[in-house]
């Protein structure tokens, strides 16, 4: 419940008032996440995405100025939403797999980006709500305070480094009888032993150095007994209040196994020291200890970091001691304890301080060990697996482990632009606009949100520098450790080193120097490509984008190289800036009060007005007293310098007590490191400026350094050769503070040595397995294609001539279909042919073929020729003349008996260029037949045979490719029944004609010549004028032309006329061999949406064999003529995110040693757009034999091809082009040329993933497939509105339109409703509406039917209506077409309708899901001409938008009306579409999702914080 967690604040009050505080917290989280996921997956146009991005960025900048955890959580959700949109865009719109190299590079980059996004999510999860735990008070009764063992492990560190830590630990503010400080010396050095005796500390060594530091600690646990153990690395000096400020939590919570505190480093790390702007940037480790660990504490997933931590002995012993399986024993130990149910905690207060790694190479070595250890944990004891952890803890560990996998992704980001600049592989296929509106907001939100979260702990862009400095070193370690997790050993990190002078550390940066050189070369390549190479726009954009990418990578790499410029380090003891009140007393007893500027273990600087030069060389006493911290210092010092009011002093330490006091003053103060986070809040631009400043420091010459001697070795430092103790288990108990002097110490030492060693040896745990472990094992600090032009029409004047005399026509090959140029024959493609059509009502009496062209002059005349055949009958031979390669014109007479209706004129080439052997693919094997060659045919008409069984002949000839004319006689053009019947017959002819041009000129009388169809009531059915006895069909001679035939469709009533028409179109096979017949009505099945026979079914896979014959999918020769598969689709198929449809294609190629299947291929194209090429290579042997058992395609090669929806139209064509190569090409062996290849007719097309949904108005849908009228095959949901008294021109346009519908659906228009314009006012039309007629003919009906159109036709002009014009601002928010169409509003449309046709589409005023398409113009002839444009393939691309004006042969298209939709989608897909077209709604939905998720997460986090720490005084702001 919300009420459980919200106690204050406006949000709490609002929720309480509305009752929402009783809603479970997971409800808004789930709703918000689902909404964010949905919004993140919606695809929109890049321009619209730009506005969404502007909105999110603006909101980010506004909210980022306000404080509060709730706003931070919301900004994280907003950032994740923007990042989600980016990654979905990357995965769905920018990836191309053109070849294996591009695929590999693109996938690698995608994996790197997925890693980055996962890291971002985990970072938000960890840092969303830092717990900000405060110290827990101790019991007032000190008798209840527990005993504590303090362990200071060491191996090979210098004693000078360890002394301070031990002295600081001995000075801890804790009861002396309950404080035991031990040096755990795995180096067994006598000097350490002697120091422990002198200081009163305990000293423990062991016989073998098994498992390095972890083994050392385990041994110490075995020989000590305090309930708590505190561990300090040998350079981590604690403050005096360390135990008082930490033990309270361990006592308050018995289940707490670990309390970790920060590792603070008082010396600068390599990045701070070496970079020009480094000292103004937070240390590299601050983010982990200042933010990440605090976030881990929130989830009870604090990591043990090996030092500055309190461990409960019971907990660590319960897991068998400190983990020894990995080189990061600390984190692994915490993981094991958490698996057992122990809790962990973190106190974000630096209570100890140590030395950072002095040099970059040492820093790299330390991080390499950490990376190896975390990857070992991932491989050996993966927190994501196994029992014992909550999911929150698993995610925290996943974040830690995955962080050290950054090397490969970081390197991938740096070098990805090289893929294009060097290899020519474009691995992000996107425009600059798309990248700008998707990638840049993703980066911007991530940077700004992380900047807000990380604030003073980590500055923007510096993580990139830190990671780049390590990446190339970690790549190998990452791979090796993943593959061999047991490999690798514990390495100690050297600290406290000195540098006499600065130098450039090539060993630490040489990989990045090499990388920088490669990037510089890439930069030069990019500049060269941009400036000196000429490219198309896309290539130029790619060059610019990748060059900019290289520049960014180069900046990061140069900054990482700058870290390698090591600065001089000549101080053993780094200075700490602090202002402390001190009193300086000189040798004369004069006291000077002042404040320190800085202090160190070596000395200090004091500001005092009494400093004089004569004090230099003298000795003074420095006193510092702090009652709060219990520190009282009085230590002598020597004056090194005294000027400008500042004394520079060096400590003159006399004994161990003086050293202890110095350590206490420098490190023991409770607030010593309170300013560890005193950095200005991050500002990304300022941070970026610091990066450039650091790069400038790399390029700037360093001034000469004056030589400075290194600090001489002090008496406490080790000599060159150390004296070692014997390998044995030895325990020296610490001496209480009261006994740390003189004889008492000696006695204690003796007792410890003689009495405790046996006890220690008795307590020592059995030695673990030591295989592979030696005494030298180190340890240290842990951590639709273009439609071709139609064939030229034969001159109608010639075609329509009617005469008993012979008619001679000459057709060029171009007229016959050779529209692409000459017929070219080659050795591998020796056969070419053309169709020669002879009309069915004519017979050839004479024919002559005239050829011209050229034959290769390199051919052998006696062995080369071109053979000409007609219908496989020999016509003639073209012989080779090397001296005259061009031939013609050459004429051949053709026997008229060879001709049928559809004739094949073939040319077969046989050629050789040498006598012994020939290569069919040699370029000199060729012959060309000019496309201006011609065939002359003399024909004569034959007497017509008038039988109904021959229908549709003689009115339709299937062999004709020219425009077909079927004159229609309507004695009464205003008769609605006759119009419906004539429209039905016209649609039948349209179905038969299919793609051929067809027109129906209308007259009221029988034409003077030729054939015609007469439709009407009570028409004569014979030459004597007899009348029909019922619904009747009859073929009679044209009274004006004995060669012509009139098909009479009649009846006694209008209803009988329609019955006769239905019988004609639905059952022509039952009419019989008679000239006339009374017919019966035909019962028709109810049609269903989208069941038009022309449309490919979309509810099941469709076999190729259902669309074409198997012979159409076969070809002969090595390069047979292309095979085509035509198919029709409803144009309203919609898929989610444009997912492609699938074609499952099976290809058969000849086996045996004929074709080189590996190099042979088949090219697949869709509507003349290339899709893919596939090899003809068969499957492997196992697959081949298994397919023989279960697969009908055995022996064929299968491929799945994606058909992009944007390449599919109403009328489509798949093209398959084989290109085979002979297996013995070039050898002196004859290659068979009569091979056959095919596409299996059982191959399938699958459109099942499509939904019927379309955005309207769209005239291209209508022009391509008569949509939306063709939705019902019989047009049963279509109403045609005509003038009340249509003239013949308008009626002809109506019949032509019905023919177009029939050709589009392959089904007669049996259900169309025809009504007059005057009927519209009192009987609104139903369904989709077609309007035909001039504005004058339609009267007021036109304005009513087009009420929702933005256009107004008035006074022979078409304009944008006043209502639409005044709402121009509204159009700014509408969806606009980006196909180059004009907008009527912005184009100020005001076009005269003079000798022009107008095609207009709009939403129906009667039904929002219905459409109106209107054909109008100034004359009926213009309307008729506009309808005929629907049958002209060349005009179809011009019919788009919602308005088309046709003036002569010129089309102008407009899109002005708002979009409406027809069809239906599932709810989720409808929402996806809606949001994809309405960026404002998408933006608001995204904000709503982010807000809901943020609200729920905020409440959940707040409540969880209360569970972790219930008291307000023990935690920070909630």
UniProtKB/Swiss-Prot annotation:
The reaction(s) this protein catalyses: [(1->4)-beta-D-glucosyl](n) + UDP-alpha-D-glucose = [(1->4)-beta-D-glucosyl](n+1) + UDP + H(+)
EC number: 2.4.1.12
Positions of the PilZ domain: 569-668
Disulfide linkage: none
UniProt-recorded Gene Ontology molecular function terms: cellulose synthase (UDP-forming) activity; cyclic-di-GMP binding
Listed transmembrane segments: 24-44, 71-91, 105-125, 404-424, 427-447, 465-485, 514-534, 543-563, 1481-1501
Catalytic subdomain B, as annotated region: 314-374
Location of the region described as Catalytic subdomain A in the Swiss-Prot/TrEMBL record: 144-237
Region annotation (Catalytic) ranges: 1-731
Localisation per UniProt entry: Cell inner membrane
Stretch list, region Disordered: 765-785
InterPro entries: Cell_synth_A (IPR003919), Cell_synth_B (IPR003920), Cell_synthase_bac (IPR018513), Cellulose_synth (IPR005150), Glyco_trans_2-like (IPR001173), Glycosyltr_2/OpgH_subfam (IPR050321), Nucleotide-diphossugar_trans (IPR029044), PilZ_domain (IPR009875)
The family this protein is said to belong to: In the N-terminal section; belongs to the glycosyltransferase 2 family.
Protein's name in the database: Putative cellulose synthase 2
Protein source organism: Komagataeibacter xylinus
Taxonomic placement: Bacteria, Pseudomonadati, Pseudomonadota, Alphaproteobacteria, Acetobacterales
Gene: bcsABII-A
């Amino acid at each position: 419940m919300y009420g459980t967690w919200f106690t204050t604040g406006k949000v709490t009050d609002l929720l309480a008032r509305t009752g929402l505080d009783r809603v479970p917290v997971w409800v808004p989280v789930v709703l918000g996440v689902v909404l964010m996921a949905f919004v993140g997956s919606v695809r929109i146009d890049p321009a619209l995405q730009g506005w969404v991005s502007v909105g999110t960025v603006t909101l980010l900048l506004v909210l980022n100025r306000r404080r509060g955890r709730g706003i931070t959580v919301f900004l994280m959700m907003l950032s994740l939403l923007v990042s989600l949109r980016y990654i979905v865009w990357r995965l769905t719109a920018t990836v191309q797999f053109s070849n294996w190299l591009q695929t590999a590079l693109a996938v690698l980059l995608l994996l790197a980006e997925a890693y980055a996004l996962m890291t971002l999510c985990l970072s938000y999860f960890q840092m969303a709500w830092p717990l900000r735990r405060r110290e827990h008070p101790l019991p007032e009764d000190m008798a209840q305070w527990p005993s504590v063992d303090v362990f200071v492990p060491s191996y090979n560190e210098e004693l000078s480094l360890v002394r301070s830590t031990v002295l600081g630990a001995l000075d801890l503010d804790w009861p002396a009888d309950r404080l035991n400080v031990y040096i755990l010396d795995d180096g067994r050095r006598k000097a350490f032993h002697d120091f422990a005796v002198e200081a009163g500390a305990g000293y423990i060594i062991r016989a073998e150095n098994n498992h390095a530091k972890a083994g050392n600690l385990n041994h110490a646990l075995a020989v000590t007994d305090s309930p708590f153990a505190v561990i300090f690395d040998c350079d981590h000096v604690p403050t005096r209040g360390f135990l008082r400020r930490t033990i309270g939590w361990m006592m308050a919570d018995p289940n707490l196994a670990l309390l970790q505190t920060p590792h603070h480093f008082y010396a600068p790390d390599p990045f701070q020291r070496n970079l020009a702007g480094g000292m103004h940037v937070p240390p590299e480790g601050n983010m982990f200890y200042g933010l990440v660990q605090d976030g881990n504490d929130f989830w009870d997933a604090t990591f043990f970091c090996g030092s500055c931590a309190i461990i409960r002995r019971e907990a660590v012993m319960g897991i068998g001691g400190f983990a020894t399986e990995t080189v990061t024993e600390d984190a692994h130990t915490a993981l094991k304890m958490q698996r057992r149910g122990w809790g962990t905690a973190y106190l974000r207060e630096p209570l100890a301080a140590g030395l950072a790694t002095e040099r970059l190479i040492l820093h790299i070595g330390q991080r390499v060990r950490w990376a190896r250890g975390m990857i070992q944990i991932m491989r050996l004891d993966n927190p994501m697996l196994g029992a014992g952890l909550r999911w929150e803890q698993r995610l925290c560990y996943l974040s830690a482990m995955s962080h050290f996998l950054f090397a490969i992704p970081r390197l991938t980001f740096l070098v990805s632009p090289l893929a294009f600049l060097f290899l020519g592989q474009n691995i992000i296929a996107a425009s600059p606009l798309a990248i700008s509106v998707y990638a840049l907001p993703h980066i911007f939100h991530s940077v700004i949100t992380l900047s807000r979260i990380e604030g003073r702990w980590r500055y923007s862009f510096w993580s990139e520098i830190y990671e780049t400095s390590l990446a190339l070193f970690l790549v190998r370690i990452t791979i090796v450790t993943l593959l061999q997790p047991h490999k690798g050993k514990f390495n100690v990190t050297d600290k406290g080193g000195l540098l006499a002078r600065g130098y450039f550390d090539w060993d630490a940066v040489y990989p990045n120097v090499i990388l920088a050189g490669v990037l510089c070369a890439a930069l030069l390549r990019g500049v060269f490509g941009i400036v000196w190479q000429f490219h198309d726009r896309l290539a130029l954009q790619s060059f610019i984008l990748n060059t900019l990418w290289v520049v960014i990578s180069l900046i990061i790499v140069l900054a990482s190289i700058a870290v390698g410029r090591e600065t001089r380090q000549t101080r053993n003891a780094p200075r700490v800036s602090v202002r402390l009140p001190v009193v300086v007393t000189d040798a004369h007893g004069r006291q000077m009060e002042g404040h320190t500027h800085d202090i160190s273990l070596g000395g200090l600087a004091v500001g005092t007005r009494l400093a004089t030069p004569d004090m230099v060389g003298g000795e003074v006493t420095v006193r510092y007293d702090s009652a709060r911290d219990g520190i009282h210092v009085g230590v002598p010092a020597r004056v090194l310098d005294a000027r400008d009011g500042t004394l520079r002093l060096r400590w003159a330490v006399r004994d161990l007590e003086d050293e202890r006091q110095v350590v206490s003053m420098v490190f023991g103060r409770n607030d010593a490191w309170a300013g560890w986070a005193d950095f200005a809040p991050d500002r990304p631009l300022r941070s970026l400026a610091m990066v450039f400043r650091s790069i400038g420091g790399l390029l700037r010459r360093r001034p000469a350094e004056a030589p400075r001697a290194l600090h001489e070795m002090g008496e406490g430092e080790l000599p060159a050769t150390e004296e070692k103790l014997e390998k044995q288990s030895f325990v020296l108990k610490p001496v209480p503070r009261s006994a740390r002097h003189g004889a008492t110490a000696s006695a204690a030492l003796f007792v410890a040595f003689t009495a405790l060693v046996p006890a220690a040896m008795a307590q020592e745990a059995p030695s673990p397995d030591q295989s592979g472990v030696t005494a030298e094992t180190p340890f240290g600090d842990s951590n639709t294609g273009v439609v071709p032009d139609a064939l030229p029409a034969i001159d109608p004047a010639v075609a329509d001539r009617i005469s008993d005399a012979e008619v001679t026509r000459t057709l060029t090959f171009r007229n016959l279909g050779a529209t692409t140029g000459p017929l070219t024959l080659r050795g591998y493609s020796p056969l070419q042919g053309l169709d020669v059509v002879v009309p069915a009502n004519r017979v050839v009496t004479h024919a002559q073929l005239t050829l011209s062209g050229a034959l290769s002059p390199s051919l052998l005349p006696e062995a080369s020729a071109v053979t000409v055949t007609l219908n496989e009958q020999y016509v003639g031979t073209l012989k080779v003349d090397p001296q005259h390669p061009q031939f013609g014109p050459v004429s051949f007479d053709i026997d008229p008996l060879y001709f049928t209706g559809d004739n094949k004129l073939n040319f077969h080439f046989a050629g050789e260029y040498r006598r012994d052997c020939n290569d069919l693919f040699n370029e000199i094997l060729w012959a060309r037949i000019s496309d201006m060659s011609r065939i002359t045919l003399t024909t004569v008409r034959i007497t017509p045979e008038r039988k109904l069984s021959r229908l549709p002949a003689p009115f339709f000839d299937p062999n004709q490719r020219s425009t077909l004319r079927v004159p229609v006689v309507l004695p009464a053009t205003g008769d609605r029944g006759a119009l419906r019947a004539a429209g039905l017959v016209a649609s039948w002819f349209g179905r038969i004609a299919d793609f051929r041009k067809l027109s129906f000129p209308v007259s009221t009388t029988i034409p003077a010549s030729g054939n015609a169809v007469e439709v009407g009531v009570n028409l004569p059915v014979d030459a004597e004028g007899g009348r029909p006895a019922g619904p009747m069909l009859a073929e009679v001679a044209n009274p004006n032309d004995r060669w012509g035939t009139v098909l009479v469709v009649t009846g006694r009533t209008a209803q009988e006329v329609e019955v006769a028409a239905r019988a004609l179109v639905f059952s022509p096979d039952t009419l019989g061999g008679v000239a006339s017949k009374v017919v019966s009505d035909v019962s028709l099945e109810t049609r269903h949406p989208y069941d038009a026979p022309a449309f490919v079914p979309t509810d099941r896979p469709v076999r190729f064999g259902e669309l074409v014959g198997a012979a159409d999918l076969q070809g002969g020769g090595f390069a047979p003529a292309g095979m085509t598969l035509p198919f029709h689709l409803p144009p309203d198929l919609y898929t989610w995110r444009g997912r492609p449809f699938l074609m499952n294609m099976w290809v058969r190629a000849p086996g045996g040693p004929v074709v080189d299947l590996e190099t042979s291929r088949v090219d697949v194209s869709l509507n003349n757009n290339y899709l893919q090429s596939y090899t003809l290579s068969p499957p492997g042997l196992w697959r081949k034999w298994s397919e023989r058992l279960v697969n009908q395609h055995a022996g064929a090669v299968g491929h799945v091809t994606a058909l992009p929806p944007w390449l599919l139209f109403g009328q489509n064509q798949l093209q398959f082009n084989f290109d085979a190569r002979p297996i013995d090409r070039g050898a002196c062996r004859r290659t068979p040329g009569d091979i056959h290849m095919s596409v299996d007719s059982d191959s399938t097309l699958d459109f099942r993933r499509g939904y019927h949904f379309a955005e309207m108005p769209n005239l291209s849908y209508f022009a391509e497939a008569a949509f939306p009228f063709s939705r019902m095959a019989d047009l049963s949901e279509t109403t045609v509105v005509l003038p009340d008294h249509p003239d013949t021109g308008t009626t002809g346009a109506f019949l032509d339109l019905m023919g177009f519908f029939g050709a589009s659906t392959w089904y007669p228009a049996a259900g169309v409703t025809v009504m007059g314009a005057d009927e519209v006012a009192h009987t609104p039309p139903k369904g989709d509406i077609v309007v035909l007629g001039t504005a004058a003919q339609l009267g007021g009906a036109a304005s009513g039917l087009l009420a929702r159109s933005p256009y107004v036709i008035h006074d022979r002009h078409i304009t944008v209506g006043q209502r639409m014009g005044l709402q121009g601002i509204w159009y700014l928010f509408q969806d606009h077409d980006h196909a180059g169409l004009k907008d009527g509003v912005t184009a100020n449309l005001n076009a005269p309708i003079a000798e022009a046709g107008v095609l207009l589409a709009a939403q129906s005023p009667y039904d929002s899901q219905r459409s109106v398409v209107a054909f109008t113009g100034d004359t009926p002839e213009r309307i008729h001409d506009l309808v005929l444009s629907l049958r002209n393939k060349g005009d179809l691309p011009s019919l788009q938008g919602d308005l088309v004006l046709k003036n002569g042969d010129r089309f102008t298209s407009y899109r002005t009306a708002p979009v409406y939709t027809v069809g239906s989608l599932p709810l989720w897909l409808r929402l996806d579409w809606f949001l994809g077209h309405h960026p404002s709604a998408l933006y608001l939905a995204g904000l709503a999702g982010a807000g809901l998720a943020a609200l729920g997460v905020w409440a959940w986090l707040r409540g969880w914080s209360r569970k972790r720490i219930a008291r307000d005084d023990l935690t920070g702001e909630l």
